[in-house]
UniProtKB/Swiss-Prot annotation:
PANTHER family: MOLYBDATE-BINDING PROTEIN MOLA (PTHR30535:SF34), VITAMIN B12-BINDING PROTEIN (PTHR30535). Residues 1-24 form the signal peptide. It comes from Halobacterium salinarum (strain ATCC 29341 / DSM 671 / R1). This is Cobalamin-binding protein. Residues 328-343 have a biased composition (Low complexity). Required for corrinoid utilization. Probably part of the ABC transporter complex BtuCDF involved in cobalamin (vitamin B12) import. Probably binds cobalamin and delivers it to the surface of BtuC. Residues 322-343 are annotated as: Disordered. It comes from the Archaea.
């Protein structure tokens, strides 16, 4: 169905809704779960990060995802066939390489002409896509929903539910978010709730970069029963670069690093470069280097609960199931390292969150979201 026959864009003034602080999931009223079980209804209107109310008159049949987390969510909801375009780092999902790749380069840039050529009914865009890109797409008559940055696990759950509502997958989204909440609750029950029992954790992105406490990655570390050492550093950046001196002085008990799926069982010496300051920490000396799937830890999408469970098991010797049902088999593509940058045009909508840092596996974190 052509977008012009069903999608309208209503621009209104909206108050910016701030995301909840980083942390585990907040309790939800029972009524919300009951509503989530209902079938989707159209038209549907949702406010996005650009202070725009997006209205879809009927269920979109052609969807483009400009970041891999949105693609992962569509796959998780069982609606991969509706996706006609993906970002360059979304091709790890099974059959995703058969879609048109609509971004490229380092840092990743959206090919507006390619997106328009796909004639999508809906484009799902991250907060880090350039505002000028969103404007160009909307000027071409494309319906674009731009997400706020998820800074908590609750934010990731809500993003999943929002994608479900926008794409007509409410029942699947309800099942997925319920499983996410169940997994987070199981982790909370399994790990100690006292600060003294929390190991000090450094999330190693490479070159000193790490995830701050006001990010969904920082929230995942805390929910897994760890204490993020970045919370003890005086910085306002969401993804600060710590000096070697700071990392050594913080002396983490555990180092967490994102790797490709085939390296999850690698040894500490294989995970940490010989020249890395991480080798001067207690974590490395004791072999407490925890590998997690980089596509899952770095993307605010349903699979975030898998590295959370893996971290909890490593931090506290628990035995929590580390996989969701119907896990997609992933392929891994090597990419070159990109330096960290801010939001593409310096004005991430609504919140101004830092947009990109380099991942240890070699891809820009912003593009991998």
């Amino acid at each position: 169905m052509h977008r012009g026959r069903f999608a309208t864009l209503v621009i209104v003034a909206l108050a910016v809704t701030m995301t909840a602080p980083a942390g585990a999931l907040a309790p939800q009223p029972p009524a919300q779960h009951a509503d989530a079980d209902r079938a989707c209804s159209f038209p549907v209107t949702e406010p996005d990060a650009s202070n725009t109310a997006i209205t879809l008159d009927s269920e979109p049949e052609r969807v483009v995802t400009l970041n891999p987390s949105a693609a992962q969510t569509m796959w998780e909801l069982g609606d991969r066939d509706a996706v006609v375009g993906v970002s360059q780092f979304g091709t790890y999902l099974p059959t995703a390489s058969q879609r048109t790749v609509v971004s490229g380069g380092q840092p990743s840039q959206t090919n507006v002409e390619a997106v328009v050529g796909l004639d999508p009914d809906l484009v799902l865009a991250p907060n880090t896509v350039r505002n000028t890109t969103v404007t160009r797409l909307r000027s071409a008559g494309i319906t674009v929903f731009q997400f706020r940055a998820a800074t908590s696990i609750d934010g990731v759950v809500e993003k999943t539910a929002t994608i479900g509502r926008l794409t007509g997958n409410c029942a699947a989204a309800a099942a997925t978010t319920a499983e996410m909440r169940d997994r987070v609750a199981a982790i909370a029950d399994a790990v100690p709730d006292t600060d003294s029992a929390r190991p000090r954790v450094y999330y190693h992105l490479g070159d000193g970069y790490t995830a701050g406490p006001n990010t969904f990655i920082g929230a995942a570390i805390e929910a897994a029963g760890g204490h993020n050492i970045a919370a003890d550093v005086n910085t306002t950046s969401s993804y600060p670069q710590l000096s070697e001196e700071v990392i050594v002085s913080q002396d983490p008990d555990v180092v967490v690093t994102g790797v490709s799926a085939d390296r999850l069982d690698a040894t500490a010496s294989a995970l940490v470069a010989p020249s890395s300051v991480v080798r001067n920490t207690t974590a490395y000396a004791t072999g407490n280097v925890v590998a997690v799937n980089t596509n899952h830890i770095n993307q605010p999408a349903p699979r975030i609960v898998e590295p959370m469970a893996r971290m909890a098991n490593a931090f506290h010797n628990t035995t929590i199931n580390t996989t969701l049902d119907a896990q997609p088999s992933a392929t891994t593509t090597a990419t070159s390292t990109a330096p960290p940058t801010d939001a593409a045009d310096g004005t991430a909508p609504g919140f101004g969150v830092a947009a990109a840092v380099c991942a240890l596996a070699g891809a820009a974190l912003v593009a991998r979201r």
